[in-house]
Amino acid sequence: MILSILKNIKKQLLFFLVYAVFLMFLVVILFKYSKTDATLWANQYWSPFQDVMYKYMTYLGDFWTASLVVLVLLFWKFKYAIIAMVSFGVTALITQFLKKIIYYDVKRPLIEMWEQMHDGTLHTVVDEADQLINYSFPSGHTTSAFSIFCILALLSKKKWVGFVCIVFAVLIGYSRVYLCQHFYEDIFVGSLIGTIGSLLVYSYIENKTFGNWGEKSLLNLK
């Protein structure tokens, strides 16, 4: 298992190197600022273009995107669809357990930064009526995004695909902070769950035998 994990990290080394840089950036932010100050620091760099980009990009980390990825993989190989489904399911369960059971009382920016939102200090994109209140830690969208793009990178094996995947994952994770839906600590842990969980699932399942049907797809059922 350990050798398989190391092999997969080496296979998509660029993905994991960029991710390591992203983690180090988050660690610096988390040590340097309080969670509200970190949000205010990032918030000052807003722009109309980013408002539109992140508003729609954030949807790539939701349940429907993960479901679509599994559906598409069914047309490639059943085995790949199973790997993705297990990966998305395991990481989502871990995040939802932490979010809804352990850290259920952790408030979102709408509550923690109510004053700044209403005195004009904080630039917001999402309407107040659509802002979430509870279950801030960890970020479910970030978990999903890193799980989705980690699996796609590992399935591809091409380094440039891995680079594109980690860029998308990072941008989706950051969108949660940009849109004032989460704090940096939420996306930090969410990204860890999504990446490590998916790497472990992939490394465990990839060499399992599924019989001939595992190599088949919806395009080749005979």
Each model region followed by its residue ranges:
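Interfacial segments of alpha-helical transmembrane regions
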Residues: 10-18, 69-100
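N-terminal transmembrane-helix/juxtamembrane module of multi-pass inner/ER membrane proteins
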Residues: 1-68, 99-129
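Short helix-capping/hinge motifs at transmembrane helix termini and TM-loop junctions
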Residues: 31-34, 76, 102-105, 157, ...
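Aromatic-anchored segments of alpha-helical transmembrane domains
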Residues: 25-29, 89-97, 168-180
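Hydrophobic alpha-helical transmembrane segments
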Residues: 58-77, 141-146
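Membrane-water interface at transmembrane helix exits
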Residues: 39, 74, 95-103, 153, ...
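Membrane-helix interface segments
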Residues: 49-50, 77-81, 157-163
